[in-house]
Amino acid sequence: MNINATLIGQSVAFLIFVLFCMKFVWPPVIAALHERQKKIADGLDAASRAARDLELAQEKAGQQLREAKAQAAEIIEQAKKRGNQIVEEAVEKARIDADRVKVQAQAEIEQELNSVKDKLRAQVGLLAVGGAEKILGATIDQNAHAELVNQLAAEI
């Protein structure tokens, strides 16, 4: 193989081309590659952060849902207790009212019974005096009559 001027000229031209590429072409290509690599890394980091944020949000939503269910159960339990308390209060009030009505009715019955007894005593006294008048054939004066009726009523 002969080394001639053409081969040396081509080698020098190639060396100039390589130096030109290293000086002017290679730095922007490397910069573009680094920029692209950085964008990809940032995108992966953002995706990772988004996945963590999503996981945290789901966990937080689950916790809030559990808290809401617990709070709802507590509210329902309080409502049941309050409902039972209202029913018990109503039953107690009804019992007290029934006792009051019963006592009042017994008092009215006792009063009516005493009134009927007094009327009956008066009628029995009048009948007794009337019967005694007929038997004796004489009339007793009104004062004695009233005194006799009262005495008989007291005895009866």
Swiss-Prot record:
Compartments reported by the entry: Cell inner membrane
Subunit structure: F-type ATPases have 2 components, F(1) - the catalytic core - and F(0) - the membrane proton channel. F(1) has five subunits: alpha(3), beta(3), gamma(1), delta(1), epsilon(1). F(0) has three main subunits: a(1), b(2) and c(10-14). The alpha and beta chains form an alternating ring which encloses part of the gamma chain. F(1) is attached to F(0) by a central stalk formed by the gamma and epsilon chains, while a peripheral stalk is formed by the delta and b chains.
Protein family according to the UniProt entry: Belongs to the ATPase B chain family.
Pfam families: ATP-synt_B (PF00430)
Gene name of the record: atpF
InterPro entries per UniProt: ATP_synth_B-like_membr_sf, ATP_synth_b/b'su_bac/chlpt, ATP_synth_F0_bsu_bac, ATP_synthase_B_chain
Protein name: ATP synthase subunit b
GO molecular function, one term: proton-transporting ATPase activity, rotational mechanism
Membrane association type: Single-pass membrane protein
Organism per entry: Pseudomonas fluorescens (strain Pf0-1)
Transmembrane segments: 12-32
Main location: membrane
Assigned keywords, A-Z: ATP synthesis, Cell inner membrane, Cell membrane, CF(0), Hydrogen ion transport, Ion transport, Membrane, Transmembrane, Transmembrane helix, Transport
HAMAP family: ATP_synth_b_bprime
SS bonds (residue pairs): none
UniProt GO cellular component terms: plasma membrane; proton-transporting ATP synthase complex
Function: F(1)F(0) ATP synthase produces ATP from ADP in the presence of a proton or sodium gradient. F-type ATPases consist of two structural domains, F(1) containing the extramembraneous catalytic core and F(0) containing the membrane proton channel, linked together by a central stalk and a peripheral stalk. During catalysis, ATP synthesis in the catalytic domain of F(1) is coupled via a rotary mechanism of the central stalk subunits to proton translocation.
